[in-house]
Amino acid sequence: MDKKINYSALRLKVGLELHQQLDTKYKLFCNCSTQMKEKIPIMIITRKLHPVASELGTVDIAAQFEYLRNRTFHYQVFNNESCQVELDEEPPHELNKEALDTALQIALLLNCDIPNEIHVMRKTVIDGSNTSGFQRTVIIGMNGHINYKGKRILITQVTLEEDAAAIVSEENGKVIYRLNRLGIPLVEIDTGILEGYTPEEIQEIAYLIGIMARSTSKTKHGIGSIRQDVNISIRNGPRVEIKGVQELGLLSKVIELEVQRQLNEKVKEETRAANLDGTTRFLRPLPGASRMYPETDIPPIVITKDYIENLKKNLPEPWTKKLERFKTKFKLSDDLAKEILGSEYLNLFERIVSTKKVEPSIVASTFVSIIKDLERREKVEVNRISENRFIELFDYLQDKKIVKEAIPEIIKYLAAYPQNGVGDALKELDLKPLTPAEVREIAKEIVEQPNITFEKAYGIVMSKVRGKIDAQEVMKIVKQMMK
């Protein structure tokens, strides 16, 4: 699709808004947990939201649209993960220092100017995702940039804000939200207008920005923890905002399909939601500038030079240097190095390869390929496995107590029985490594069958020894025995 369209001739303009949850102990304005582990609500409250005029006397068009939909909002409350602050029954507490530190580090990594005083603002949102009818947000960085293909990509601003409640269902004007996501610290990174780039290049730019944020090792991972909003226009046409692209790999397709929609339809300024297949659906009119006003319950926060200097001293290794180090020191391919850089297992990967005598490519492939495949194809709940179990797994590999082919089966076992160890998996699955002599003994009767081909003999032998010896070694043994 991309080859058939000249995006430069269309004057494609794109603006990115990347939202990344921070992995802090507490929420942004209270001491509730951010882990979202609770499944059963302890109560449900019901609200109706109404728009109010800004200090200039105007009502935001998007807020008015949501109000006219006349919906009722039902909020699920969870123990230790929701409190009076989320219910809008209590003023916000002091801004979370851990979240501010991390957000400022991200802004510094993006070469932003940091204001010497920051102010929490209220942004009107009455779609029900905020019980208060507004989202608290604070600008903590401006005028930053990253480099891409020799060009400077403008980062207009970085904001620290509270995440919205997660929608559970909507039917007949009744909307149900979970309150445990509301208030989790979230960093929003906004780019300047990207013009002269293809959808694939814009996706690469989004990836680079995401890597910068995740290099702090203080960001959450998994579905819903990072979301992209994208603003798109062509040929001086109206701007369309598309919200909620949850998979980075879908971003280029969303842009391509939106360009085609704008070419084939008469469009107007509006906000649309991204679907899982890359198409979009109408949400509401595009919001205006009348929905921002000061948060009166939180005083301005002074950002001193000493504070910023201390943060600069503890900035993580730049991702570009880490990428080159992974490729040169660990001999990872460019693709594998980039994948592990963006993985939630990055820190664990570095810990293992720095302390174990195992091949880094095997460790990286386990975390970015094997685990993904098991989660996608077999719905294995890998998140049930602790870091210590993974470390134990590679201890066994280092000591040659298992072969790399056994890793997928062991991971499946550990996910099913997280209380058990790798040793238990070996016994239960009968994955004790075989010697070449033992394989020859198993293969003897098979290769001696009349008219059997190498491919068939190899397949039969592998079915009997899979996970107990390297596949290349089996191939070598069978070839030798069939000469």
What are these regions (language model features)?
Residues 224-236, 327-351, 361-377, 414-417:
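Core structural elements
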Residues 336, 348, 358-367, 389, ...:
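Residue-level detector of well-ordered alpha-helical segments, enriched
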Residues 456-483:
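Short, amphipathic C-terminal "tail helix"
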Residues 363, 374-384, 392, 396-397:
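M16/insulysin-pitrilysin zinc metalloprotease superfamily fold
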Residues 1-317, 328-334, 355-358:
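Basic, nucleic-acid-interacting segments
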Residues 382-391, 404-466:
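Strongly charged, low-complexity linkers/loops
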Residues 323-327, 350-354, 372, 391-398, ...:
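Amphipathic alpha-helical segments within well-ordered protein domains
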Residues 39-40, 210, 354, 365-375, ...:
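Conserved mixed alpha/beta catalytic, RNA-binding, or beta-rich assembly cores of soluble enzyme
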